């Protein structure tokens, strides 16, 4: 299997950039969060889920589906629905690597709805970058490729992460 060429520092830079955009309420219609390192995927998914909609809107306009329990047609149908009493509908697809017919999501990602935000969490491996699904996500949304840090990168990343939380740590 070919390596993607993305390094851990690239993952951290993309993660920080996306966090800044989300904090500024600049949302993409599609988020593809993929890769071997689940921390960044889960953190961005949680941030998006808690930021896009107000608490009162989530009951009607935020849906979470799991890849093993669904298929691409159902996800596309959910994404094509209109939001109820809100400006956005959020569809979170977790465990997308187990979704039947993942490439059929390209029907949606090639022309996403302006009122729906689709968040695709694809863990354990990357989506095929040659697929129409990936190309639609990259062209019409945001893609985070999350790679595992090498052993020598962990200490510096932990220090930075803990510093951002307002604490200090000594090596």
Task: Report residues per predicted region.
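Non-catalytic interfacial helical region
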Residues: 2-16, 24, 31, 39-171
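P-loop (Walker A) phosphate-binding loop of NTP-binding proteins
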Residues: 36
